[in-house]
Structures are given as C-alpha cells and as structure tokens.
Amino acid sequence: MSTKEQSATLLRLNKQEQVKALQAVGFADITESSRASEFPNRIKWATGLLDMRVACNRISDNSKWYFTREEWSSLTPANKLKFIRRGLCIRAHSQPFVIAAQECYAEGLSTSFYWGGLGKTIDGLSQKLLGKMYTCFTGKEDTQLILDALKGTVSNGVEGAPAAEAAVAYKAFTLDGDGLEDTTEWFLPSSGHMMILYRYRDQINEMLRAFWSSDSMLLTDKYYWTSTNYDTTNAWTCNVNTGHMVVQNKNTNMFHVRAIAED
C-alpha cells in the first residue's frame, strides 16, 4: 500500500471514529457522508453552548426562520415586520430547542400552577432520582404522558395537569391578535432542559432583552416546574437563578411554567 493510500485509509478510519462519537452524544443525522468541516461545530455543540438565535415565523407563509443577533439587527424595520418572533432558539449540550419569550399565564393573569396528579401512577413516566434527572431530555414525550394520564381526573381538589396543560396551550402569537396562528407544539421542559436554562441564564436574558426590549421576558429568581417525575407525590422544580433542583409536592405547591418546543 502506498503512502498516499495509507493516508487515505487513516483519514477514513479517523472519520468513522468521529462519526461514531458524535452519534453517541445524540447527533443521529451525522453519517460518514457528512462533511468533516461540520464536525468542529458539532463538538462545540455537544460540550457546551453553540449559539442562540431568535426563532421567527414569516407572516406570508408561516415558514420558520432563525436570525442571530447581528442578522436581526441588520434587517430594516420593514423587513422585520415580515416576521413574528416565536421564541429564542438555543443549541447547547447536543440539544436544540426554543424557549418561549414569556411565562405561561392562567386565567386572571396568574403565573403559578399546580403540577397535579398527586398519588397517581402515570404509565410510561419513569421516576428520575438525583443522578438521572440531570440527563433527562424527554420533556415532549413526558408532557404527553402526563396529559393523557391525568385528563379528566381530580386529585385532592386539583383537576388534570395544570402545569403541563399551560405549557401546551401557550401561544407566541394568534390569528386574531397577530394575523397568524402559532402551531408550535410547546411542552413542559424536562429537568435537563431547565439545567441548560440555568447554566446559560445570563446569555439567555441578554438575548431576550436584545430581541424583545423588555425585562419582563427575563428568566428570574423563581422556581419552575419540569415534566420530570420524582415519585407519585413529587416532581422536580428548578430555580433558574440558583440552579437548585428541588422535588416539590405536585398538589401543594404552585410554581411557574416556561414552555419550550423542539427546534
């Protein structure tokens, strides 16, 4: 085998190992046919924060668009009016998701909710103790399991699953109010998602302030519900100011909800 052939073989074998490593951390779309020039960004994404962009829908066709802070700032006022901002897209630790620009509200403008379902076993929703809780990113699936199991139920005076229901009911914009209906499938974040929000809280708040020009959108010193179950009595909550993950009684305590969606 010539030196040139040996080099080509080594490069191919190295690429195969890189592909396996990237697939192992969640990048199923990476294959041997992927460009190697893409790998450095994926490695950065796997190990920390890759980027944050404003997630928008174009009014003319409801298509999804994403802009960096610089790209959004470069648009003329007329061009900005062609889009409705849906939320902030975050790509970090192999996870791509969009965080809602504001908290969920209940009737009467309350921002606090029960989790619901005290004492009830939710089929398919596994219990997450302290270790596994940090790597749980099944928020969308878990939210649906919660809704299906608790629909029409009443537990200790709490009907259904208020926190999960608030998350899926969230709308970034509506046909009546904005001329376009938000069809995003919002859900209650998992504990892993909330830890990302805590870890990059300052950067997230900076971007929320830049894109929405309002401090009312910011992540603040509050406890937020997650969709991550601890047991039949408690679920995980996260204080995004301190990073404290605390199990709280599902029907005794009322906490805030910040919906997210898959990118």
PLM region descriptions:
Residues 1-182, 251-263:
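Short, compositionally biased
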Residues 153-187, 191-251, 262:
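An exposed tryptophan-centered "aromatic clamp" motif
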